[in-house]
Amino acid sequence: VFSLLVFLFSCGKKEAEKVEKLPAEDKKTETTETVKKERIISITGVGDIMLGSNYPSNSLLPPNNSNILKDVESELKNSDITFGNLEGTLFDSGGTPKTCANPSVCYVFRTPSTFGKYLADSGFDVMSIANNHNGDFGAIGRQKTKENLDSLGIKYAGLAGTNESVIFEKDGVKYGFAAFAPNNGTVSINDIEHAKEVVKNLKAN
């Protein structure tokens, strides 16, 4: 479960075109009129993304480590910004798997780092890591996931105290994202006052 907040700091950016007018009969000066056009920004938002897990077994990976996003890649890339919720961790080995009260319904996801390329190839610009699986392998899993996303140039938000929001520029437009969830280690969706501060800080920048 997660919630997304996005700001387009420059969504009202104007592009100007100059149109020349003929001088009036009684004037010898030219006047220039500016015609302003609004720039339309398109954003594609994707829900839970889990490309496969090598934990507890490689049998949970797709056949031949195939890219399950391939068939929708062109659609995902057909936007100014593509956002998704990374449901799990992104690293190869290690970490401490979480324990569950009921092991029969315990889901723990560790997607191999090489699968991160599928996210980049599909045009993902920013990911929410605020969800119930970002802590599946504890602090090590979170840190390794961040490092792998950094190496791919994919931004992220949603971790309490460290990466609560993110601001970045693309094609001359400045974007701000925040992500919230009701889970440990994430920016709490239930702490309204803190959420207001996160939003306030985004708007101030």
Where in this protein do the model-derived segments appear?
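Sec-dependent N-terminal signal peptides
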Residues: 1-6
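C-terminal motif of bacterial Sec signal peptides marking the signal peptidase cleavage site
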Residues: 8-10
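Acidic, metal/ion-coordinating pockets
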Residues: 12-205
